[in-house]
Amino acid sequence: MPFGNTHNKWKLNYSAAEEFPDLSKHNNHMAKALTLDIYKKLRDKETPSGFTLDDVIQTGVDNPGHPFIMTVGCVAGDEECYEVFKDLFDPVIEDRHGGYKPTDKHKTDLNQDNLKGGDDLDPNYVLSSRVRTGRSIKGIALPPHCSRGERRLVEKLCIEGLATLTGEFQGKYYPLSTMSDAEQQQLIDDHFLFDKPISPLLLASGMARDWPDGRGIWHNNDKSFLVWVNEEDHLRVISMQKGGNMKEVFRRFCVGLKKIEEIFVKAGRGFMWNEHLGYVLTCPSNLGTGLRGGVHVKIPHLCKHEKFSEVLKRTRLQKRGTGGVDTEAVGSIYDISNADRLGFSEVEQVQMVVDGVKLMVEMEKRLENGKSIDDLIPAQK
């Protein structure tokens, strides 16, 4: 699916009704929120870097969504998008983030000492633990809209900045352009590297332009702390390791992330943040903390139980297949993570994962012994 260049005034020769996209078969947040009135009001506006309403919505027009999975259907091309096109983004954000209002303020908490427990998840069930977030560099357009020069600047800032990390964070940068196909595939299979840009959502939003120019992966020597450069966001920061010690994974995440932010601020390049949206990222689904704390957990009995989806809903968690979003679970191994990004702090979100997964393991053990789990079903968080 090619990226349609929509940055032009030519279409203003046609009325809003003539240009309004056909969203009759769509199941995404953008399609739900976009009315002809909103389209009419916003279609001739653009951000300082030239991103238009049609650029915002194109990925959601081209990808109607899935009957059972509500996708977001819009992206931001720069920091100003969320303000210039707020008539569309505000209802999308409110819908996607459980009623988060335009007047609400987000909270940030990256103090790892505030996490309770998390070092005792049973490694016979919890196979690996991971925490990730995204960060955007102020003053540079986001991946759907950035120029080649901007993208290369992001890469240069990352290479120079990350090279100064020491101790457990000492590592090396590997540009995608010099990697062999076999090396790339190995890193993807090991869950260290982002996939090749085959996702229609990525392609239709313009994020895959000039691939693999300016993209790469940096990781520390232990491969337990990684930074993806110029995929869906300028930076994706990831802390991960085998087993169930989420406390250690979160400690490394918080310490490493603070070090990276200090490096960028020192270079005169802070991250996009405001008190309403928290950290500003490309996809509205990641606003706030941008954090996804996830574990791979083996739950062959619980995953077949009729109450499984109810347990997930009540603990504010979501499940994905073993390989991440849009994949199947292999050998009853699920990727369980926090459903929220906005309105809860980093500590609160990881706490939900720790508490919820601990409960799921307890349920799995009960079911192994043929016992009921009805008394373990939690109240709604």
UniProtKB/Swiss-Prot annotation:
It comes from the Eukaryota. GO terms for molecular function: ATP binding; creatine kinase activity. SUPFAM superfamilies: Glutamine synthetase/guanido kinase (SSF55931), Guanido kinase N-terminal domain (SSF48034). The keyword Kinase applies. ATP binds at residues 128-132, 191, 236, 292, 320-325, 335. Its EC number is 2.7.3.2. Keywords: ATP-binding, Cytoplasm, Kinase, Nucleotide-binding, Transferase. It is found in: Cytoplasm. InterPro entries: ATP-guanido_PTrfase (IPR000749), ATP-guanido_PTrfase_AS (IPR022415), ATP-guanido_PTrfase_cat (IPR022414), ATP-guanido_PTrfase_N (IPR022413), ATP-guanido_PTrfase_N_sf (IPR036802), Gln_synth/guanido_kin_cat_dom (IPR014746). The keyword Transferase applies. Coiled coil: none annotated. Residues 11-98 form the Phosphagen kinase N-terminal domain. Residues 125-367 form the Phosphagen kinase C-terminal domain. Pfam families: ATP-gua_Ptrans (PF00217), ATP-gua_PtransN (PF02807). Dimer of identical or non-identical chains. With MM being the major form in skeletal muscle and myocardium, MB existing in myocardium, and BB existing in many tissues, especially brain. Reversibly catalyzes the transfer of phosphate between ATP and various phosphogens (e.g. creatine phosphate). Creatine kinase isoenzymes play a central role in energy transduction in tissues with large, fluctuating energy demands, such as skeletal muscle, heart, brain and spermatozoa. Belongs to the ATP:guanido phosphotransferase family. This electric ray muscle-specific creatine kinase (MM isozyme) is isolated from the electric organ, which derives embryologically from skeletal muscle. It may be involved in the electrical discharge process. This is Creatine kinase M-type. It comes from Torpedo marmorata. The lineage of its organism: Eukaryota, Metazoa, Chordata, Craniata, Vertebrata.
